[in-house]
Regions:
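A beta-strand edge to alpha-helix "cap/lid" segment located at domain peripheries
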Residues: 25-65, 72-164
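Compositionally biased, low-complexity segments enriched in small residues
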Residues: 2, 12, 26-29
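N-terminal secretory signal peptides that target proteins for export/translocation
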Residues: 1-7
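Bacterial N-terminal signal peptides
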Residues: 10-22
Length: 164
């Protein structure tokens, strides 16, 4: 009987400790003030605009700066490319953009202000490597991480929006 009381008390203690630990782990990360959130949102929107400019001007230095070393992107076709592959493709000039613009961007902030996700629309037009005109509209989702004081895009995906 003494053993069962000790076991029951030990089990009760472990259950309470587990419950407290679970509640502690479920707490949100450090809260971000509204001013910090607004600054992060503005910064991510600016980076999206720079990304569009990179394609318009074939400026790989922008992408070198804003894409993380392990960056991966999935295009509407399902084709996947890394940072190195995306920059190499822009350097070869396979496509020449006359339009490259992101719009309707919504930014969400997570992880105490260290992670952001932006969702928006993207319109691009120009000529492909064979001189054939193209025009595409897509909706994108990008994941940004704050590391060493700078925002870097680690992953993105675009889905085609049919033109009417």
């Amino acid at each position: 009987m003494v053993h069962s009381q000790i076991f029951a008390r030990g089990l009760l203690f472990l259950s309470i400790a587990f419950a407290c630990g679970s509640v502690a782990l479920a707490q949100p990360a450090t809260a971000v003030t509204p001013a910090q959130k607004a600054a992060i949102e503005a910064g991510i929107k600016d980076l999206s605009a720079q990304w569009s400019t990179a394609y318009l001007k074939n400026d790989t230095s922008i992408l070198e700066r804003i894409w993380a070393p392990d960056f991966v992107y999935v295009e509407p076709s399902g084709h996947r490319f890394t940072k190195e592959e995306g920059i190499a493709a822009l350097k070869t000039g396979g496509e020449r953009h006359t339009v490259s613009e992101a719009s309707s961007i919504d930014v969400r902030v997570y992880g105490g202000g260290t992670v952001a996700v932006d969702i928006g629309d993207y319109k691009e037009a120009g000529k492909d490597k064979d001189g054939k005109p193209f025009e595409r509209v897509s909706r994108f989702t990008n994941v940004w991480v704050l590391k060493d004081g700078a925002w870097r895009c680690v992953s993105g995906h675009a889905s085609a929006i049919p033109t009417r």
